[in-house]
């Protein structure tokens, strides 16, 4: 399945458009306890969200496990999800990884949309179709490759992040800059992390995602 990445300027209209292309009888939103508080209020104001079922799991990567996965399956089941339902994964890489795996396995697969809320998830985790959970003390030990229908990147969510989370994503962008153009690298190293310009960062995120997409195209299953 081809994944479409949208650099958002009008999140509500872009989400409405994406949902119109995702067959769904019911809509679900997966958050963790952090994004439920910091990010979900933005979506709750959208008309297209008025009947959405919200499923919330504990935050942090330590909860990217079978217990949280079962919580999502249970939430989908109790909410009456069918094979024709759709789930939005709203959060960082933990949410997009686990949510993608849950959606890919529930009813043998339902549509899902990723709306990453961390810089690292925007330029890496949410793009490329890798989904999964930690198991037996090992990271990402169980999972599948399955693309979300859409990835919607809205850099406004980055206002909710602390410096450590911004730096984590920026480090991944630097890796992309090293294997891309000199111009991209120079813009990255001169970017002011202390006073980030969100419009400039939005463009840089788009450039970084293009590098990630080229990597995935060359080796989609990390052979």
Model-derived segments and spans:
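ATP/NTP phosphate-donor binding region
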Residues: 1-86, 175, 199
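General structural feature for long, well-ordered alpha-helical segments within catalytic domains
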Residues: 39, 65-68, 115, 166, ...
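Predominant activation on well-ordered alpha-helical scaffold segments within soluble catalytic domains
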Residues: 70-73, 171, 175, 185-189, ...
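Acidic-aromatic/histidine active-site loop/patch
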Residues: 93
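Catalytic nucleophile loop
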Residues: 96
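A glycine/threonine-rich phosphate-anchoring loop and its flanking beta-alpha core
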Residues: 101-196
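Active-site segments that bind and position negatively charged phosphate/pyrophosphate groups
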Residues: 191-223
